[in-house]
């Protein structure tokens, strides 16, 4: 497997949100939401849409914390390799890297972040970045 080395610049740290951040932290980075929707248990969880830095970004919040983020190009064109690299770079903390993992047969390109807490999938139209929740059987 190949490790994608992510070069982070200071701009990326200050301008983009990370999985696990609160709604206030993400709004401080992306600006005011363009659209807000509710889902899940009694509508307490939300999907919030932003437009920032060339991307349309849909963020899924569970109990007020970002758990999933989907990045689309604003012009609605297919995601380029360069755009995928940008999303991976902005979805990692300093010192973290992304490792490509073998996709399922005919599956999309997939990566795991070096801390083991986040994965990313590129569908061709968008990049989905998700927190990984491990549920241990009781």
Where are each of the predicted segments found?
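N-terminal signal peptide c-region/cleavage motif recognized by signal peptidases
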Residues: 12-14
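Boundary of Sec targeting at the N-terminus
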Residues: 16-18
